[in-house]
Amino acid sequence: IGWTWLVGAKADGYNIGGVDLPHIVLQPMLRPEGQPGYKTEQLNPLCCLVFDPDILIVSEKSPFKSFGELIEYAKANPGKVKAATVGKLTGDHIFLMNVEKFTGAQFTQVPYPGGSKAAPALLGGEVDCYFASTSNFLRMQGARGLAIATKDRYELCPDVPTMNELGYKLESAKYRGLATPPNFPAEAQAYLEAALAKVCADPEYQAGVRGAGLLPYYRDGKAFGEIIEQEKEKARKTLKEQGLIQ
C-alpha cells in the first residue's frame, strides 16, 4: 500500500519512502495480471542503508546441533520438519525454497505475519526451525544459528558457518533503503544522497544500526538501483524454477 502510494506521490523532493528487498521485486512479479499497484521500476532508488543476510536458526533446545544434522533429517523425513517464515512468497520463503533446491531437503512451511510471531513460535516449539533475517536472530535469546547465507563469515555473528563453507554456493539477503516517486528532481537527489551519506558515516549512527542487528551498508541511488536489478533477476529465476511465474 505504501509503495503504491509512493509511486503516485508528487516528486517534489519531500516525498520519500522506506523500501525493502526482495519484497519490492517479488510483489509486482506475483501480482495477478491487471491488478493495480506499483511496479518496481517506478520506484526511484535514493540510497541503500543496511544489509541483512538470511540465516537458518533453531532453538537452543533443538536436537539439531548443525546444519548438516537438520538437513539429513529433513531429507530422510520429507515434510516432517516445520519451518517458520514471515509469510509465503517473502524473502524468507525464497531462502527456504533455495535451501530445498540446493540440499534436496523438504520442509513444511509455517508462515507467520512477522518476526514478532515467528520468533516465539520457534522458541515455544511450534516449529522446528526458522528461515529468518539475521537481524531477527541477533535480537533473540535462546536461538542457535546453523548456517548464514553469506559468502564469508558475517561480522555480527562470526561463529555461524556460512552456506558457502558448508558446500552450498547460496547467498541470500535483504537490503533496506530509501526510494522516491519517479521523475525525482536531480538536484534533490544529489542533495539527499550527500546528506544521507554523511549521516550514514557517523560513528554513533553506525553503532546504533549494529546494535539493532543490522550492518550499515550505504550505497547511492545508482548503486542501489544495480542491487535492485540483481535481486530482481535472482528472484525471477527462483520463482520460475518453482513454477510460480512464466
Question: What is the predicted role of each segment?
Answer:
Residues 1-11, 74, 97-102, 116-130, ...:
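Short helices/loops that flank or line small-molecule/ion binding pockets
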Residues 5-16, 28-114, 163, 168, ...:
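Hinge/capping helix and adjacent helix->loop/strand transition within the periplasmic-binding protein
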Residues 7, 68-71, 119, 123, ...:
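Non-transmembrane alpha-helical segments in soluble domains
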Residues 16-19, 112, 131-133, 148, ...:
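Short beta-strand and adjacent tight-turn residues that come in two discontinuous sequence segments
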Residues 22-34, 98-102, 124, 129-158:
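A ligand-binding cleft/hinge motif common to bilobed small-molecule-binding domains
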Residues 65, 117, 158, 183-188, ...:
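Residue-level signal for the nucleotide or nucleotide-sugar donor/cofactor binding architecture
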Residues 101-105, 186-246:
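An extracytoplasmic/periplasmic, membrane-proximal ligand-sensing/linker region
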Residues 112-117, 153:
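Glycine-rich "substrate-gating" loop/helix at the edge of Rossmann-like oxidoreductase active sites
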